[in-house]
Regions:
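Histidine/cysteine-enriched polar flanking segments
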Residues: 1-130
């Protein structure tokens, strides 16, 4: 890297803040490094967004859900979410749908990895030679 970023490192959060995007990250399993590693291996950071502020994550990652709770997220069961989906999506609250399951994680997949778009935007045809 000619600009020297490789030697000194790049602080992503600091860089984003300097351009006006000040984010507050929620770390997988909080601040305990041992718990972070444990829940990372059970896909604690793997989530699927349903709407702004609403996403699906594994219920088995209890420390990650607790950390999300400390950042204002409400944890709900899938059945409650389905009964009140419009309320949760349109309500503006921060919600995590806590998906139960231990078998799926064995295949190294979380909620994001287990999705497939049902509709896609049409893409423009490629020009010849590109």
């Amino acid at each position: 890297h000619k600009d020297g970023n490789r030697e000194r490192g790049v602080d992503l959060l600091g860089s984003l803040k300097r351009v006006g995007l000040d984010l507050c990250p929620v770390f997988c399993s909080g601040s305990d490094p041992t718990a972070q590693r444990r829940e990372q291996w059970s896909d604690g950071a793997n989530a699927f967004a349903l709407a702004p502020g609403v996403f699906v994550a594994y219920a088995r990652n209890e420390r990650t859900l607790a950390e999300l709770g400390r950042h204002g997220y409400r944890s709900v069961q899938p059945e409650e979410f389905i009964r009140n989906a419009s309320y949760f999506i349109d309500g503006g609250d921060k919600v995590v749908v806590a998906l139960k399951g231990s078998e799926l994680v064995r295949g190294r997949g979380g909620p994001r990895c287990l999705t497939l778009p049902l509709a896609r935007l049409a893409s423009a045809p490629r020009k010849s030679g590109s």
